[in-house]
Amino acid sequence: MKGQNVTLQDIAIELEDTISPINLHCEEEIETEEVDTPNPFAITATCYACEQVLRLAVVTSTEGIHQLQQLLFDNLFLLCAACSKQVFCNRRPERNGP
């Protein structure tokens, strides 16, 4: 500050002195990475036991939906609510694990 009375110009001069001399407004561009955002997908499959049509809605990435597709083609099977209830209710509770 210069003198007894503080002016806006004095404060601005002090700020200029404390600011780093590095030019932060350079023309360098940073590459942005593409992020695979989750998307909604509708899946139609059939029940493993009774072949009733099942419809699922999931939200996942493109990679996630490909992984699910591979599981459904390989060795993952879905059950409808009725078949699931029948399978799990007819088992003893201690056998409901792996």
UniProtKB/Swiss-Prot annotation:
The unnamed zinc-finger regions cover: 47-83
What residue intervals hold the motif LXCXE motif?
24-28
| Top-rank taxon | Viruses
Question: Which residue stretches belong to region E7 terminal domain?
Answer: 1-37
Q: Which UniProt keywords apply?
A: Activator, DNA-binding, Early protein, G1/S host cell cycle checkpoint dysregulation by virus, Host cytoplasm, Host nucleus, Host-virus interaction, Inhibition of host innate immune response by virus, Inhibition of host interferon signaling pathway by virus, Interferon antiviral system evasion, Metal-binding, Modulation of host cell cycle by virus, Oncogene, Transcription, Transcription regulation, Viral immunoevasion, Zinc, Zinc-finger
Q: Name one Pfam family in it.
A: E7
User: Which cellular compartments is it found in?
Assistant: Host cytoplasm; Host nucleus
Gene Ontology terms for molecular function: DNA binding; DNA-binding transcription factor activity; protein domain specific binding; zinc ion binding
User: Does the keyword field hold Transcription regulation?
Assistant: yes
Q: Which GO terms describe its biological process?
A: DNA-templated transcription; symbiont-mediated perturbation of host cell cycle G1/S transition checkpoint; symbiont-mediated suppression of host innate immune response; symbiont-mediated suppression of host type I interferon-mediated signaling pathway
What InterPro entries does the record point to?
Papilloma_E7
Checking SUPFAM superfamilies in the record gives: E7 C-terminal domain-like
> Motif Nuclear export signal residues?
65-73
The cellular component terms of Gene Ontology attached to this UniProt record, alphabetical and capped at eight, are: host cell cytoplasm; host cell nucleus
Regarding how it is modified after translation, the entry says: Highly phosphorylated.
Q: Does the keyword Transferase apply?
A: no
Record text about domains: The E7 terminal domain is an intrinsically disordered domain, whose flexibility and conformational transitions confer target adaptability to the oncoprotein. It allows adaptation to a variety of protein targets and exposes the PEST degradation sequence that regulates its turnover in the cell.
Say which family it is in. Answer: Belongs to the papillomaviridae E7 protein family.
Its subunit composition reads: Homodimer. Homooligomer. Interacts with host RB1; this interaction induces dissociation of RB1-E2F1 complex thereby disrupting RB1 activity. Interacts with host EP300; this interaction represses EP300 transcriptional activity. Interacts with protein E2; this interaction inhibits E7 oncogenic activity. Interacts with host TMEM173/STING; this interaction impairs the ability of TMEM173/STING to sense cytosolic DNA and promote the production of type I interferon (IFN-alpha and IFN-beta).
Q: What does the protein in this record do?
A: Plays a role in viral genome replication by driving entry of quiescent cells into the cell cycle. Stimulation of progression from G1 to S phase allows the virus to efficiently use the cellular DNA replicating machinery to achieve viral genome replication. E7 protein has both transforming and trans-activating activities. Induces the disassembly of the E2F1 transcription factor from RB1, with subsequent transcriptional activation of E2F1-regulated S-phase genes. Interferes with host histone deacetylation mediated by HDAC1 and HDAC2, leading to transcription activation.
What is the official name of this protein in its record? Protein E7
Q: Which organism is it from?
A: Bos taurus papillomavirus 4
Q: What is the lineage of its organism?
A: Viruses, Monodnaviria, Shotokuvirae, Cossaviricota, Papovaviricetes
